[in-house]
Amino acid sequence: MSLKISATKSFGRFNWKLYTALLLTAVLPTIYTTVRINYLGNIPGDWGFNIASQLAWVNLMLEVVQEALILPLFYCIGITIANREETINRVRTGMTVTLGLYLVFTVVILLFATQLTEWMAQNPDTISATAEYIRLEMVGTTLFSMVRFLIIVFILLDMKEHIYAILGIQVVTSIALDSYFLSDLDFSLQLGVNGIAYSNAIASFITLVYAITVFSRKMDMGFSDWKESHDYSWMGSWWDVGKYSGLDSFVRNIFYMIFIVKMMNVVEEQGTYWVANGFIWGWLLLPFYPLADLLKQDTSGPNTIDHKEKTYAYFGIATVMCILWIVTIPFWGTFVSEVLNASDYEKIVGLVLILLPFYILFSYNTLMDSVFYGKGRTELLAIQSIVTNVSVYGTAFILFKMDVFSPTLTTIALLFGTGIAVDSIVTFSMYRKLLQESNGML
C-alpha cells in the first residue's frame, strides 16, 4: 500500500468527533489553570509560585499510582466494554481499589508532608506553608482520581457529551471558586495558595457526583447495584498490565523528582520552571494529549488493521502541531508576560526554547507509548524507562560527583532534554520490534 493511499485511509478513519471532544476536555482545564496562574502572579513576591510549584513532586508520586491503575484501564475495560455486567463489575471494583490506594497515599502525605518538603530542598521560609497547602490538596486529588477513572470509561463508551459536561463543570466551578478564594478582587477571601486547594476539593466533589450519576443512568444502575457482590477475579489481569506501567512511571518519576525538581529547588528556580512547565504542558501540548488518548482507545480493541492505515493520521497531526509551535514562537513572550502574568517572562521563554526540540521528539515518543498501552504491552514501557533513566541520570550523577556537571537552570533543562532524546531512541526501537512481531498489524 502506497504512502498516499495509507495516509488517505488513515485520515478517513480518524475519529475526529471523539478527538474534538477530548481536545475540549483538555482546553477547559487549561483555561482555569491559566486563570489560576494569573491570580498567583498578583501575590506579592514569588512565594505564591514557589509554594504552588511544590505540588509537582506530589503529582509525580501520584502519577505512579495513576499510571499503574488508571491508564491500563484502556486495555482492561476496553476488552469487555461491550459486556454490560462485566463492565459494571470492573468499574465498581476498580473504583473501590483505586479509592483505597489513594486514601493510603493521602494518609502518608498528611503524616510526612513537612519532612518530604524539607527533603525536596524547598526554601526554609516557606516549608510550613508548603506542607499545609500540600495536605489540603490531597482532598481534591483523591476525589478527582475517581473522576479520572470514569473519564476513561466514558472515552471507551464514546460518551462525548458527558466528557464535555464534566470538564465544563470543573472549569466553571474552579474559576468561580478561585475568584472567591484566591484572586485580588474586592469580594475575594484572598486565602493565597490554600485557596487553590479549597477550589480543587469542591470542584472535584461536584464533578465526581455528576460522573457517577451519568454512569449509573447509562448502565441502568440503582444505588443498590453499587453495593452488590463485587467480583475481583479480574484484578490479576489488571495487575499484569499495571505492574509494568507503574514500574515505568516509578522509575521515570523518581529520577525526575531527584534530578530535575529537587535540583530546581536547590538553584532556587522552582517558580520559573513551574511556569515554563505550565506553558508547555498547558498550551503547547494542549492538542497533543487528547491525540495520544485517542490512539490508546483506537489500538485497544480486538480488531487489527495495517499499522500505516491506523497510525499515519496520528503522526501527521502531531507533525502539524510541532510546526505550529515553531510558527508561534514570536508570540510566546507576550503570552507569558500578559496572560500568565509572569514578570520574569524572558527567562521562562528562554527555558521553553531550550526544551522545544526535545518536546518535538517527545510528541512522537508518546504516540508510540500509546500503542504500547493500547496493546497491553506495558512491559516495554518499563524496560525503556529503566534503560533511559539509569543511563542518563546515572551518568549525570557520576559527572556531578566528579565536578564536571554543575546544576544551573540551563544545564538541568538540558539534562532533562537528554533523557527525552535517549528515551525516544529506545522507544522507537521497541515500537519497530512490536510491528515486526505483529506483522505490521495494530
Where in this protein do the model-derived segments appear?
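Membrane-interface helix-loop junctions in multi-pass transport and translocation proteins
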Residues: 172-208, 338, 390-424, 433-439
